[in-house]
Design a protein with these regions (language model features):
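Bacterial Sec-dependent N-terminal signal peptides
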Residues: 1-25
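Short acidic-hydrophobic surface loop/beta-edge motif
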Residues: 75-84, 177-183
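Loop/turn elements at helix/coil->beta-strand transitions in domains of secreted/extracellular proteins
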Residues: 130-134
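Well-structured core secondary-structure elements of compact alpha/beta domains
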Residues: 20-31, 51-59, 85-129, 143-166, ...
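A cross-kingdom feature marking charged/low-complexity
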Residues: 167-193
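A cross-family detector of function-defining hotspots
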Residues: 57-79, 152, 158-161, 170
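Start-of-domain marker
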Residues: 20-74
Length: 209
């Protein structure tokens, strides 16, 4: 047993020393080429790592680095380092259903329900008759911050919004404008595009360097 340990020690020491001398570029290349990147980070690099599942809620507007990489990143590709201490590798991706929608939101904490409903009906009528564009109505009336994008919420993932809105949007045709009531107020929704499949989830490996 002592002989085996004695023989293994130089190998372990060499492997550790070798991993310590690798440049960032070499580490990234080795991770990308490794059959099992997790095992490589754990057993060869001897680095702390974490595996996360990232959900892409919107493929147009991203909340930060994680969902942006999850959507735009290529599988097996290693990105970074970030903050001089972390590499990020996209291990796998899975699809979800996305629909592009626009919104004019009337807040019932500001208006009574009766006034909000009357205003919403007026807005919908003006849009449907061509008296005003959805974009103009969003810039003028929306209280949810959509004025800056003329009402456009981007490509929204199924499950990213409340279930009743998800169900109603799924039933509607492209171009339809309709109202949905929630506890927050009334949402005037335009289904800008039909649903499509796109990257909705990604498995991410973070390696501390």
């Amino acid at each position: 047993m002592k002989i085996i340990i004695t023989l293994l020690l130089p190998i372990i020491f060499f492997q550790f020393a070798w991993s310590q001398k690798l440049t960032i570029t070499q580490i990234k290349t080795n991770l990308e080429n490794a059959p099992n990147p997790v095992a490589y980070a754990r057993d060869v690099l001897k680095k702390q790592y974490k595996i996360d599942t990232i959900i892409v809620l919107n493929s147009t507007h991203f909340s930060g680095l994680a969902d942006s990489l999850a959507y735009h990143g290529k599988v097996k590709k290693v990105y970074g380092p970030y903050q001089n201490k972390m590499l990020v590798q996209v291990l796998a991706k899975l699809p979800n259903t996305f629909t592009r929608i626009s919104q004019v939101f009337i807040d019932t904490s500001i208006f009574t329900r009766r006034i909000a409903d009357s205003l919403a009906n007026s807005i919908v009528t003006r849009i449907q008759t061509g008296a005003a564009s959805f974009e103009d109505m969003a810039q003028t009336y929306s209280m949810g911050g959509e004025g800056a994008t003329k009402g456009d919420l981007g490509w929204v993932a199924r499950g990213a919004i409340i279930p009743q809105m998800d169900k109603e949007i799924a039933k509607r045709k492209k171009g339809e404008v309709f109202k949905i009531w929630t506890k927050a107020g009334v949402h005037i929704i335009k289904k800008t595009s039909d649903a499509k499949q796109d990257t909705g989830f990604a498995l991410i490996l973070r390696v501390m360097i």
